[in-house]
Amino acid sequence: MAAAFSSTVGAPASTPTNFLGKKLKKQVTSAVNYHGKSSNINRFKVMAKELDEGKQTDQDRWKGLAYDISDDQQDITRGKGFVDSLFQAPTGDGTHEAVLSSYEYLSQGLRTYDFDNTMGGFYIAPAFMDKLVVHISKNFMTLPNIKVPLILGIWGGKGQGKSFQCELVFAKMGINPIMMSAGELESGNAGEPAKLIRQRYREAADIIKKGKMCCLFINDLDAGAGRMGGTTQYTVNNQMVNATLMNIADNPTNVQLPGMYNKEDNPRVPIIVTGNDFSTLYAPLIRDGRMEKFYWAPTRDDRVGVCKGIFRTDNVPDEDIVKIVDSFPGQSIDFFGALRARVYDDEVRKWVSDTGVENIGKRLVNSREGPPEFEQPKMTIEKLMEYGYMLVKEQENVKRVQLAEQYLSEAALGDANSDAMKTGSFYGQGAQQAGNLPVPEGCTDPVAKNFDPTARSDDGSCLYTF
């Protein structure tokens, strides 16, 4: 008995019509020519009817597409219920708000920039911002027959805000730079710093390749690659750092890692370096074709503008800020930040006395209460001037005493306390600040007849022979 079987070739399609839509019609043909043979098996093919917007019903889930003019970003919940929740963005997060006005969309979904010289309430010097923005922009442009220096060297006095001003400009331009410091320009392994510079450069190039502006930012280049006199040793790594930066400046689109070579060009990455004295660097590195140099010396207006940003939350009047800046003309901008920090010393001292010295560690490091919170101290011009003169006096002590020379020339401590003795701040004052400790009184003048070497506070009983 022959086995019975049926073939599915030429059989009608088993796809349900509901899957293809409710408004689709079926056409039946009487005869189909199939592989040269005539077949009378019924066949159908699916055809979409012409769209008639007037005949659409509420049952059609895509009815709104015919006349939809909304923005997809603002109407993001259109597919709610039809898309797996795994692929739905969380509501209330940026542009995923269900209802957004055009202003909200611009402010949350798009990054917009203003063209003033402030960032987050901080002042950016116009000359500084101009130099940095122009240099970065030029390196991303194709200028006809122009060789643009790859490196911008910003140098000047200590504490003048070079690094901080750079960070403000980067933030204003929407740049997240690849950072390096002078401490990474030396290593126990020969060649490591030069390799690291190339790696960081290529990391920045990869970010640019992905469509986001980036740059390489090296802090205090002269401290890591410069020669500071006879006390510093010039190593192979110093030579290779200078040579690597020179090579990158000459071939910015062909930066290769050691041990490999890739013919594909990498994007050009502008390099920003800061320092205090570029005369310590290798001279061919700082020539004009490779490095564009910018000497940063803030003017009085720049100093006032930066100080307004420092004291912006302290309600210090502008005229008082101007008076403080004019009272300390030879100080760096960093001096005024340290001056503001000194005002909080009184608050911290009061907190320490209330907490107890033995409980400071438990309260600050291992406490459920969290760090202490202070009320903002009132900053008056008198208090700021007082602390300012204290800082200046400490600076003068460092310059005047110079204990290092005495330590190198003498085996013992020597006359390390002679300066304090001459100024009258050695005897008595340190012991009197300790609170209720017993202070032996007596004559503390070595010239007096009844000089008492054990006395720590002068009681006015000194006798002199004339």
Swiss-Prot record:
Residues 1-48 form a transit peptide. The keyword ATP-binding applies. InterPro entries: ATPase_AAA_core (IPR003959), P-loop_NTPase (IPR027417), RCA-like (IPR044960), RuBisCO_activase_AAA_helical (IPR048571). Keywords: ATP-binding, Chloroplast, Nucleotide-binding, Plastid, Transit peptide. Residues 429-454 are annotated as: Disordered. One of its GO terms (cellular component) is chloroplast stroma. Coiled coil: none annotated. It holds the Pfam family AAA. One of its GO terms (molecular function) is ATP hydrolysis activity. ATP binds at residues 156-163. The keyword Glycosyltransferase does not apply. Its main location: plastid. It comes from the Eukaryota. It is found in: Plastid, Chloroplast stroma. Activation of RuBisCO (ribulose-1,5-bisphosphate carboxylase/oxygenase; EC 4.1.1.39) involves the ATP-dependent carboxylation of the epsilon-amino group of lysine leading to a carbamate structure. Belongs to the RuBisCO activase family. This is Ribulose bisphosphate carboxylase/oxygenase activase, chloroplastic. It comes from Oryza sativa subsp. japonica (Rice). The lineage of its organism: Eukaryota, Viridiplantae, Streptophyta, Embryophyta, Tracheophyta.
